[in-house]
């Protein structure tokens, strides 16, 4: 089977979901191509889309929250939004790309390509199965104006929310958010720490801010370091934000208990090595930590879908969170000291996690294309 995965460079979460599906499909012998859809219109378009999104999220997050609220108000299955028509402009280019490469199925972990694919279906330009994958624990605006063959959603409890927004319930498959195989297995904590050159006999906090380095990370890290009185170590992964990385490295250059990391492909191993993770409530990072069974403290969300992610996790005792920085730090220390609370969260995570989403999505594509997987 020849699979096309369409994503967009608006943060690493969507790309991580796509890479998880790609990994699972290639493991089963399928041919997979994963691209940023907007590159079909040129690098300028791709950079403009990603630059605008990331710029708003990093520098004026309250405006992103406002846009999200407006989107929720105008989003409807009865009419098409400006977002739909903007993405529809790529119909012909995407149709030509799919036909020229003879793909058997297409899957997207991002709304924008789903809009384009839906327009193609309306114009009879799409003749292969198309599957969308939700990467947040809520139905974000404009999903209901798409028309995919199936929608993979993060959890069974979200079925009603998606259905009430206008997506046919028979198209909703609560398989989970796909994560790479490395997050579905565990390296022993001692072994992980040895490989990462971290101490074996002290508590370790892992602080993650996402690939964009979102949030008041420098302030948070400084306060956490001050509050660590029991020789705890802190590992800070600050994403692609090289400015924050430089600031933190300068701030903690004389503090051997603070380890500042930029973007890394060893997140899974760092999770294995830590005792508690502080993370912004992005759908992917939260799911990776959930699948890993690590006590989670959610930090300040990007207004919009991340606030919904926090609410979903807190309701099911999968994480703890607070809007106040000092309380967030306190909660992390409590999760280390209170073994009963720690164990309760781990039990809840084991009950709710869905580690096989990527494999099941590949199985769905095989069914839709009638691919024979027998030897």
Walk through the language-model features, giving the residues of each.
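C-terminal "capping" alpha-helix adjacent to the active site of nucleotide-linked donor transferases
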Residues: 314-340
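C-terminal alpha-helical cap of glycosyltransferases
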Residues: 354-375
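Conserved N-terminal ligand/cofactor-binding loop architecture of enzyme catalytic domains
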Residues: 20-95
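Acidic donor-binding loop of glycosyltransferase active sites
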Residues: 272-282
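Donor-nucleotide binding loops and adjacent catalytic segments primarily
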Residues: 199-274
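Active-site and donor-binding regions of nucleotide-sugar-utilizing enzymes
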Residues: 12, 69-166, 171-174
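A short, well-ordered alpha-helix in the C-terminal region of glycosyltransferases
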Residues: 341-355
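A nucleotide-sugar donor-handling region in carbohydrate enzymes
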Residues: 149-204, 208-211
């Amino acid at each position: 089977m020849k699979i096309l995965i369409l994503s967009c460079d608006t943060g690493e979460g969507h790309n991580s979901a796509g890479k998880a599906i790609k990994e699972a499909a290639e493991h089963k012998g399928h041919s997979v191509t994963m691209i940023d859809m907007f590159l079909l219109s040129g690098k300028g378009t791709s950079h403009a889309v990603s630059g605008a999104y990331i710029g708003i999220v990093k520098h004026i997050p309250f405006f992103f929250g406002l846009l999200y609220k407006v989107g929720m108000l105008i989003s409807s299955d009865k009419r098409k939004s400006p977002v739909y028509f903007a993405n529809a402009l790529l119909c012909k280019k995407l149709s030509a790309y799919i036909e020229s490469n003879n793909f058997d199925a297409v899957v997207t972990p991002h709304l924008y390509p789903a809009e384009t694919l839906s327009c193609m279906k309306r114009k009879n330009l799409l003749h292969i199965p198309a599957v969308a994958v939700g990467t947040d624990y809520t139905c974000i605006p404009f999903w209901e104006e798409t028309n995919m063959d199936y929608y993979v959603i993060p959890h069974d409890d979200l079925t009603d929310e998606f259905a009430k927004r206008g997506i046919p319930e028979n198209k909703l498959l609560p398989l989970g958010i796909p994560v790479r195989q490395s997050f579905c297995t565990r390296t022993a904590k001692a072994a992980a720490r040895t490989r990462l050159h971290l101490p074996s006999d002290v508590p370790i906090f892992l602080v993650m801010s996402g690939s964009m380095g979102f949030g008041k990370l420098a302030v948070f890290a400084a306060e956490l370091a001050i509050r660590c009185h029991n020789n705890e170590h802190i590992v800070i992964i600050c994403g692609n934000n090289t400015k924050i990385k430089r600031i933190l490295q300068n701030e903690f250059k004389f503090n051997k208990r603070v380890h500042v990391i930029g973007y890394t492909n060893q997140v899974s191993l760092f999770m294995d090595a830590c005792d508690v993770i502080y993370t912004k409530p992005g759908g992917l990072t939260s799911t990776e930590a959930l699948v890993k069974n690590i006590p989670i403290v959610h930090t300040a969300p990007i207004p919009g879908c991340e606030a919904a992610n926090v609410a979903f996790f807190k309701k099911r005792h999968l994480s703890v969170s607070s809007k106040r920085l000092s309380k967030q730090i306190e909660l992390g220390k409590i999760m280390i000291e209170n073994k009963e609370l720690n164990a309760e969260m781990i039990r809840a995570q084991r009950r709710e996690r869905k580690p096989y989403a990527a494999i099941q999505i590949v199985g769905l594509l095989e069914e839709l294309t009638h691919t024979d997987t027998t030897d």
